[in-house]
């Protein structure tokens, strides 16, 4: 419901363009760094080329139909929700990693870089004014959400993100 009302497909497409442009700017900057060895530069460019952006909302929604909710049972609802989530997490054991899973809800005003998946994630709620407006000019959007995009890209190469390769493998 939140996404339907506050984040249309045109906003998702516009955000995709901004991310692609900033990734390209980072690629050019890394290519021009003279203090990096050629091998290090190549690894950085490879990693940057494998960044996966997630914009707005997940490709598929979690199914909560099996969760019993009773308006008159706050404590029971909490206990059932915790049990439901625990069962969902336990079901992941031995299963392939779901690369479509999000670790933040669309209505959260935040963004994150996930080094284990080499992905940058921008929930729909941060893609609203004053950070982002699909009807605003490029200068306003680069000044708003562009700073957030650059910040999240930067995490891929900071003291923690640099420990992972472009496939999300811990290498250092």
Give the positions of each predicted feature.
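Intrinsically disordered, low-complexity linker/terminal regions across diverse proteins
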Residues: 3-152, 156-172
